[in-house]
Amino acid sequence: MSVFLIVLSCITLAFASGAVYYIKLLSQAASYPPKRVIRQKALVCSTGTAFTLCLIFFTKLLA
């Protein structure tokens, strides 16, 4: 069970760092890649972070 939580924590960390990276990239004035693509990537990473945090929460709640 603890290995599962460690794996989920690593996945959460990867998604969170990706979200921070893309949000930082979104604030820069570059024209490529398009802002909508960066916004979509940031949204996917943020959603992945929230989903894995919910999995960790409910796993700890049920265990």
From Swiss-Prot:
<feature type="transmembrane region" description="Helical">
    <location>
        <begin position="42"/>
        <end position="62"/>
    </location>
</feature>
<keyword id="KW-1003">Cell membrane</keyword>
<keyword id="KW-1133">Transmembrane helix</keyword>
<keyword id="KW-0472">Membrane</keyword>
<keyword id="KW-0812">Transmembrane</keyword>
<feature type="transmembrane region" description="Helical">
    <location>
        <begin position="3"/>
        <end position="23"/>
    </location>
</feature>
<dbReference type="GO" id="GO:0005886">
    <property type="term" value="C:plasma membrane"/>
</dbReference>
<protein>
    <recommendedName>
        <fullName>Uncharacterized membrane protein YhzF</fullName>
    </recommendedName>
</protein>
